[in-house]
UniProtKB/Swiss-Prot annotation:
Substrate binds at residues 37, 59-61, 91-100, 217, 235. Transmembrane segments: none annotated. The keyword Lyase applies. The keyword Cytoplasm does not apply. SMART domains: OMPdecase. This is Orotidine 5'-phosphate decarboxylase. InterPro entries: Aldolase_TIM, OMPdecase, OMPdecase_AS, OMPdeCOase_dom, RibuloseP-bd_barrel. It is an enzyme of class 4 (lyase). One of its GO terms (molecular function) is orotidine-5'-phosphate decarboxylase activity.
Length: 267
C-alpha cells in the first residue's frame, strides 16, 4: 500500500483527475466519499449541501432518481461540486463490449461522460471496455476523466476475487492515465511497475456490521490500514435517525486520522 502523502502522490500521478482529487483531499483533509442513493433530486441536493464540506468525492447512481434531468439535476450538482470542492463519481458499473459502453457513457438520458469526473467498470468483457470508455470521454469533453475498475466487492458471496481480481488488475494496466484505480477491499499493488492506483472501498461503517441483503461492513481503521485511499460511506451518513452533518464530520475525522496513522507509521 502507499505510505506517501496524498500531495506527494498528486505531484507525480499520471492521471490529471487523480492528481486533482489527491490535492483536494489534502486541502480539505478528507478521504470520505459520500454514496447517496436517494430517489429525488431535491433530497440528493439537500444532502450534498450538508455533506459537501466533509467529502472529497460524491458517488451517485443517477438512474435511481425518479425525476432526473440534465438541467434540474446535473447543473446544480456541478455547482455544488464547485462550491464545496469535491469531484463526482457516477457509479455506473459498465459491463458491456467497448462500442456499447462508449454509447452508454456518452449518450441517452444521462450523458455521464459530460459531467462525471470518474466512473467505473467491470473487467468481465476484457480490455476493450477501457478503450471504449476512454474514446467516449475524448469525444464529448475536454475535461479530464478517470475510470475505476471493480476488482473486489463488499457484498457477501461476491464472485470478484482470485483469478477474476488478478485479470481485472491486468486490464487496468492497459491504460495508465485513464484507469486511476480500483473499487477494492485491499491494496492492489502495481507500484513496482510504476502504477499508483487509488483504492476506493465501499462497505465502510463505524456502527453497523451489515444488512439483510448481503452487505458486509468493515471499520474505517481496518480498510485504511489495509491500503484503502478513499472510504465510501452511504447509509452510515444519512440513514433514518442519523444527522448527516454530524456523521459527515465523524467519518471525515475517522478517515483522516486513519490516513495520518498510515503515513506516519514506521516502514
Amino acid at each position: 500500500m502507499s505510505t506517501k502523502s496524498y500531495t506527494s502522490r498528486a505531484e507525480t500521478h499520471a492521471s490529471p483527475v487523480a492528481s486533482k482529487l489527491l490535492r483536494l483531499m489534502d486541502e480539505k483533509k478528507t478521504n470520505l466519499c459520500a454514496s447517496l442513493d436517494v430517489r429525488s433530486t431535491d433530497e440528493l441536493l439537500k444532502l450534498v449541501e450538508t455533506l459537501g464540506p466533509y467529502i472529497c468525492l460524491l458517488k451517485t447512481h443517477v438512474d435511481i432518481l425518479d425525476d432526473f434531468s440534465y438541467e434540474g439535476t446535473v447543473v446544480p450538482l456541478k455547482a455544488l461540486a464547485e462550491k464545496y470542492k469535491f469531484l463526482i463519481f457516477e457509479d455506473r458499473k459498465f459491463a458491456d463490449i467497448g462500442n456499447t459502453v462508449k454509447l452508454q457513457y456518452t449518450s441517452g438520458v444521462y450523458r455521464i461522460a459530460e459531467w462525471s469526473d470518474i466512473t467505473n467498470a467491470h473487467g468481465v468483457t476484457g480490455a476493450g471496455i477501457v478503450a471504449g470508455l476512454k474514446q467516449g470521454a475524448q469525444e464529448v469533453t475536454k475535461e479530464p476523466r478517470g475510470l475505476l475498475m471493480l476488482a473486489e466487492l463488499s457484498s457477501k458471496g461476491s464472485l470478484a476475487h482470485g483469478e477474476y481480481t488478478k485479470g481485472t488488475v491486468d486490464i487496468a494496466k492497459s491504460d495508465k492515465d485513464f484507469v486511476i484505480g480500483f473499487i477494492a477491499q485491499n491494496d492492489m499493488g502495481g507500484r513496482e511497475e510504476g502504477f499508483d492506483w487509488l483504492i476506493m472501498t465501499p462497505g465502510v461503517g463505524l456502527d453497523d456490521k451489515g444488512d439483510a441483503l448481503g452487505q458486509q461492513y468493515r471499520t474505517v481503521d481496518e480498510v485504511v490500514s489495509g491500503g484503502s485511499d478513499i472510504i465510501i460511506v452511504g447509509r452510515g451518513l444519512f440513514a433514518k435517525g442519523r444527522d448527516p452533518k454530524v456523521e459527515g464530520e465523524r467519518y471525515r475525522n475517522a478517515g483522516w486520522e486513519a490516513y495520518q496513522k498510515r503515513i506516519s507509521a514506521p516502514h
